[in-house]
Amino acid sequence: MIREKFERIKPHLNIGTIGHVDHGKTTLTAAITMALAVKGYTKAKNYMDIDSAPEEKARGITINTAHVEYETDVRHYAHVDCPGHADYVKNMITGAAQMDGAILVVSGADGPMPQTKEHILLAKQVGVPAIVVFLNKADQVDDDELLELVELEIQETLTTYEYPGEEIPIITGSAITALESLTAKYVLRIGNKWVQKIYDLMETVDEYIPTPKRDTEKPFLMAIENVVSITGRGTVATGRVERGMIEVGQTVELVGLKNTKEAIITGLEMFHKTLEKSVAGDNVGILLRRIQKEEIQRGMVLAKPSSILPHQHFKAQVYILKKEEGGRHTSFFAGYRPQFYVRTTDVTGHIKTFQGKIDNTQIQMVMPGDRIQMEVELIRPIAIETRMRFAIREGGKTVGAGVVTTIVQA
């Protein structure tokens, strides 16, 4: 089957829904695609299309980050529906790391919950630059004053995590009521109060979330999110291009986790359409020649040859989450071995030493809420570089978040 070409007419942005479990992220994603489909901008996706993996349907929660595409009057969006269940924050980290902006979904009936706060913190740590809030389930709240109190609480929470809480737009609506209106046969879709709230939300996203300046000048790099094998054609690696650009026919290196290996790009696709060239910000599938499926895995990066090296040993500045932020309840010591989440990989690391952030004195014990410097040795080499952000997790909790300051050469 011949695929059509991807036409680059409108600016492309990566956006996502974040927030607490059952606050309505996936329902809102479905409502957005349905509302924009009415205007002829996209194909409608229902809730079950987005909530696609079998274990998601069985438990009614989103596990893998799900990608959909849609357009507004002025932009083309790739939308990632981020998981809300505590066990699956690692996928949320992968999804958030790909976002140019986020829609924070908060139930008007419940207000901000522990995962709401954790997702805001993670969004800040992985560099999501702008957030718009959708205050959902407004149809379940009769008291306007209660919704105003929830708005204030959301603003305070955002400000706590260094987002401009008082400036961030908050759109109040009901994703499920809008979705029901959009799927009903005899309801006027345009002009419906709840559907209009979805259009208001997307107009706000268009206006408030800035079009990012893509980092196309630096050497190409893409963290691999998934790998599939196509019989007779080769191996496809999918992910978001972090920086640079790449064309069919060019050579790339596979870096991290295993021995570094070269491959030739024989095809590029985005949303089932072919590309000759892919640039920073694109969510692409890259067809690779000379690579077997077992030689490549999620967590590796594809990069311009010799532009990035695998390392195991680094120093970093780290913030250790408080108990109220979903972090540890107790202190820990040198020798602690949590998981380090970097781009799309997670690998166990041995924390060798701690130092105070300000005075550089050696510390024996670290408490929740501390800001420290630490030296880490990973059990496997991965593609890391200075100024790169990461999260630290243990037993289903985000323990800390940090940034690499120094690579320690072996």
From Swiss-Prot:
EC assignment: 3.6.5.3
GO molecular function (one):
GTP binding
| Top-rank taxon | Eukaryota
Which top EC class applies here? Answer: hydrolase
* Region listing for G5, in residue ranges: 174-176
TM spans (from-to): none
Region G2: start and end of each range?
A: 60-64
GO CC terms in record: chloroplast; mitochondrion
Task: Report which reactions are catalysed by this protein.
Answer: GTP + H2O = GDP + phosphate + H(+)
Where on this chain does GTP bind?
19-26, 81-85, 136-139
Where is region (G1) located? 19-26
Residue ranges, annotated region (G4) = 136-139
Domain (tr-type G): residue spans on this chain: 10-213
* Region G3: start-end pairs: 81-84
Keywords in alphabetical order: Chloroplast, Elongation factor, GTP-binding, Hydrolase, Magnesium, Metal-binding, Nucleotide-binding, Plastid, Protein biosynthesis
The UniProt annotation places Mg(2+) binding at 26
InterPro entries attached to this UniProt entry: EF-Tu_GTP-bd, EF-Tu_GTPase, EFTu-like_2, EFTU_2, G_TR_CS, P-loop_NTPase, Small_GTP-bd, T_Tr_GTP-bd_dom
* Location relative to the cell: Plastid, Chloroplast
Listed under GO biological process in this entry are: mitochondrial translational elongation
* Chief location: plastid
Under the heading PANTHER family, the entry gives: ELONGATION FACTOR TU, CHLOROPLASTIC, ELONGATION FACTOR TU-RELATED
Q: What does this protein do?
A: GTP hydrolase that promotes the GTP-dependent binding of aminoacyl-tRNA to the A-site of ribosomes during protein biosynthesis.
The record's comment on protein family reads:
Belongs to the TRAFAC class translation factor GTPase superfamily. Classic translation factor GTPase family. EF-Tu/EF-1A subfamily.
Return the NCBIfam families for the record.
EF-Tu, PRK00049.1, PRK12735.1, PRK12736.1, small_GTP
- Return the protein name: Elongation factor Tu, chloroplastic
User: What organism is this sequence from?
Assistant: Codium fragile (Dead man's fingers)
